[in-house]
Amino acid sequence: MTHPPDTIVKSILSHISNPCDIQKLSLQDKLTLAEELRSIIIKTVSNNGGHLAPSLGVIELTLALLATFNPAEDKLLWDVGHQTYAWKLLTGRAHNFSTLRKLNGLSGFPKITESQYDHFGAGHAATSISAALGMAMARDLQGLKHHVIAIIGDGSLTAGMAFEGLNQAGAMGRRLIVVLNDNEMSISKNVGALSLFLSRNMERGWVRRVRHEIKDWLKSIPSIGDEVAEYASRTHRSLKTVFTPGILFEAFRFNYIGPVNGHDIESIEKHLAMAASIDDQPVLLHVLTKKGKGYEPAEKNPASYHGLGAFDIQTGIPKSNSQNSPPTYTEVFGKTLCELAEKDKRIVTITAAMASGTGTSLFKAKFPTHFTDVGICEQHAVTFAAGLASQGYKPFVAIYSTFAQRAYDQIIHDVCIQKLPVTFCLDRAGIVGEDGATHHGAFDISFLRCIPNISILAPRDEAELQSAIYTALSFNSPLAIRYPKGNGVGVTLPNESTPLPFEGELLKEGHDAIIIAIGSMVMPAYSAAQQLQEEKNLSIAVFDSRWISPLPQHQLIELANTFNNILLIEENALAGGFSSAVVELFADNQCLHGQRIQRIGIPNYFIDHGSQKELKQCLLLTVDGIKKMLLQMLQPE
């Protein structure tokens, strides 16, 4: 285990005023600095939460990169970017690293507006190679000579976009370095043929030695030695795939180097220099790292320490989440799906490298033949599900709202046009908190409700989520169920659920105004209405639309013709979202007759990082925010 922060005898980091200062350090100083970085990262993440295991695994690689390249000139692009904590500490942000992932603090990902050394923003996987190739082409067009380096993990390399980038880079032959950070993990354990390919015969030094010894021995044979050795070399090219993972990348016309010990700074620097010296084709340097390196709990269970909240350093146990808290929406989803699968063997579950995050690990354990983790391949996941649905199965695609964006064409082309009964379970819909703009589930209502043939359902609590899963089983067409990150509201879960009706529900009667809300905003709206009745004697009605597409039209039209003050609330982008759909319905049915209509939702700009509570307060997506808006609406003109 790494030393606690207060036991670091000598601070090297405090003397790093410029990233290039690392090039002046001795090897021993770099090793000391690596320990210092580990201690700071562990301490900070234990307080703030964050992506611990990925960042601990690349500290030596980060130091070697900065010892070899000049980030003021060379372009270094980190794929996904959740492993860049050491990078941030070494590129001028050590003084405010304690603000990591906090409101108005440092982002947990590369961000071009945060530092000149963050050359390309990230958050989603597999973008680095394509972006780096674009930068390499721009460099060549301008006649410049700097290096462009993409650092990508083996998890990201399961994504099709990474191979599209490799394919184009090889065809173009641009001078480009790709560093493959191979820790045999993405978030969940890596899957697919590529993972098996990379993990085969990693320690290949003996292979090289044996090959050279055999070749030397063959050459020593009198008369025919050279001829036999040449034949053996040709045969070796055919057999190379047995021993060499690099053959895959060489097929893409990359010069393959490695694998290299990713925690041996000296060795990494040597091989990075070798890669930098090759100027006639792209290069891939294969680096082997250990996720969670230096913190024993993270080394033993890297998936649990991939991304986590605040925790106790000594035990590794999370600090929050009281045992008395309601179950999370994710947990309710996973448990309910397993209950249904016990009764209906048509149910299959698909996730994209997020089994633990989407709550499907339990399903995987109980029904392994009906579970598929496709890796970071959202496009494939959706069309794979469509194929299953076409053969009579009931596929549930468990995916974060933000990652569903990556499969938009497949949702339309392969599922909705054919009206196949695929259920999209959109976890983390709405504001997710500290991961920021790349991870908020802000757009799913907007990009889904314009598609024909798909229904969209947003349960208001964990009991309704349970019912929504039951509803999906009775559906014979596409369905999306969206639900937020975090704990439920604390309602009792029934032992047996029934499908939800195709209508909304009036939860509270009133006459001064009505709140029409959806999903996660229904219960805050109800609380706000109750409080205003007690505090201000205001009579506020509350309607849970429940369905976004199709809307409960007759109910909404009746409400529009009844109330003069209407507040529409959603945890989604206002542009094209639920409230837009309701106002369109009112306009199309001549229901607009001078009412005051206000909307609360996510405005038309990208929401930065901060806690869910803080961000929702800023956006009025809270009980107090709703009360404030209602009081403004009800003021006399």
UniProtKB/Swiss-Prot annotation:
GO cellular component term, pick one: cytosol
Textual note on the cofactor: Binds 1 Mg(2+) ion per subunit.
Residues reported in the UniProt entry to bind Mg(2+): D154, N183
Pathway(s) this gene product operates in, as recorded in its UniProt entry: Metabolic intermediate biosynthesis; 1-deoxy-D-xylulose 5-phosphate biosynthesis; 1-deoxy-D-xylulose 5-phosphate from D-glyceraldehyde 3-phosphate and pyruvate: step 1/1
Pfam families recorded: DXP_synthase_N (PF13292), Transket_pyr (PF02779), Transketolase_C (PF02780)
Highest taxon above the source species: Bacteria
Enzyme Commission number, as recorded: 2.2.1.7
GO biological process: 1-deoxy-D-xylulose 5-phosphate biosynthetic process; isopentenyl diphosphate biosynthetic process, methylerythritol 4-phosphate pathway; terpenoid biosynthetic process; thiamine biosynthetic process
Primary enzyme class: transferase
Gene3D superfamilies per UniProt: 3.40.50.920, 3.40.50.970
Keywords carried by this UniProt record: Isoprene biosynthesis, Magnesium, Metal-binding, Thiamine biosynthesis, Thiamine pyrophosphate, Transferase
GO molecular function terms listed in the Swiss-Prot or TrEMBL record: 1-deoxy-D-xylulose-5-phosphate synthase activity; magnesium ion binding; thiamine pyrophosphate binding
Keyword Cytoplasm found: no
CDD domains according to UniProt: TPP_DXS (cd02007), TPP_PYR_DXS_TK_like (cd07033)
Cofactor field: Mg(2+); thiamine diphosphate
InterPro entries: Dxylulose-5-P_synthase (IPR005477), THDP-binding (IPR029061), Transketo_C/PFOR_II (IPR009014), Transketolase-like_Pyr-bd (IPR005475), Transketolase_BS (IPR020826), Transketolase_C (IPR033248), Transketolase_CS (IPR049557)
Positions contributing to thiamine diphosphate binding: H82, G123, H124, A125, G155, S156, N183, Y295, E378
Record PANTHER family: 1-D-DEOXYXYLULOSE 5-PHOSPHATE SYNTHASE-RELATED, 1-DEOXY-D-XYLULOSE-5-PHOSPHATE SYNTHASE, CHLOROPLASTIC
Family as reported in the entry's similarity comment: Belongs to the transketolase family. DXPS subfamily.
Subunit text: Homodimer.
Protein task: Catalyzes the acyloin condensation reaction between C atoms 2 and 3 of pyruvate and glyceraldehyde 3-phosphate to yield 1-deoxy-D-xylulose-5-phosphate (DXP).
Name this polypeptide is given: 1-deoxy-D-xylulose-5-phosphate synthase
Naturally occurring in which organism (per UniProt): Lawsonia intracellularis (strain PHE/MN1-00)
